């Protein structure tokens, strides 16, 4: 296993501060809360993106991982498979994760938006505002 600070320094992140205190492990209700959050995302209709999605892209990996990777929004492949970073960007992310001695199963991967914007356009500020509470709960 690599040292987190050394890895961050190697990729150009010179200053790293934990912004939140580590919290004690959640009780058994945390699993229920995670499932509840997944169901809320799955049934979300807060913005117009729900009309054009194939499915939501909640996130994948270890929900209690030390490493969290956040993308902007799902693309076509992610929308079809329901998993973030599965296209070319996913291959690159897999290589990056592997290079620091981790596997995809040891991290958590999510997007800010949980639905694909049409024609892979950039997310609108209003869409980000609607999805951000979901991401904050995932974090």
PLM features per residue range, with description:
Residues 2-139:
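A polyanion-binding, active-site-adjacent surface
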